[in-house]
Amino acid sequence: MRLPLILILLAALVPVFFGKTRSAPFWLAVQAVALAWNGAVQHDAGGLHALAAMLEVLVVRALVAPLLLRRAIRQRGEPNLDLMPSNLFTWAIGISLVVLAFDFGGAAMQDVPALALGVVGGLVALSLLLLSTNNAAPAQLVAVLFMENAIAVFESLLPEPWAWPVHAALTLVYLGTVVVGCWLIGTPQPRAPAPALPAQGEAS
């Protein structure tokens, strides 16, 4: 089914081109819901492993990660700026990268695996563009989590889901990335000391 793949890509395109930093957790949750939907479509949704994987995506990626990221962004207290600087140059680069990614993947709307490869390439391209255009810590973490979702889309093309130990290890890696990243973002930045004022006698 093509609709969840299209939704995953749209949930990355909209925040990168039009969204603010504080809206990123919402779009990460939308991506996660679409990932769970895509996983249920690709594999047998009635199987125990598929149900556990879908529940893991909904709980960890759609609920826990966005909540932690939202709290960290609020603790940081920075202005709610654009996720990616809005200018024609970055827009042209972003659109070109997405088009090239789909061309590389040979994405055709009738071919679901090819479309999935195009979505993977588009997500990776947008993540790298975001990493290179915005050096703010929240935007950097959002780009990393977008790339994690691209890996999850690629994994959905596997004929069989990962074995339980591998799946648990990947979930722990993702959780560790989110927890450490949000902890670093939420830690207040040390302020530079104010310059010392000259003594009154020296000023005169």
Please report, for each region that a protein language model flagged, where it lies by residue:
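Alpha-helical transmembrane segments of multi-pass membrane proteins predominantly involved
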Residues: M1-S204
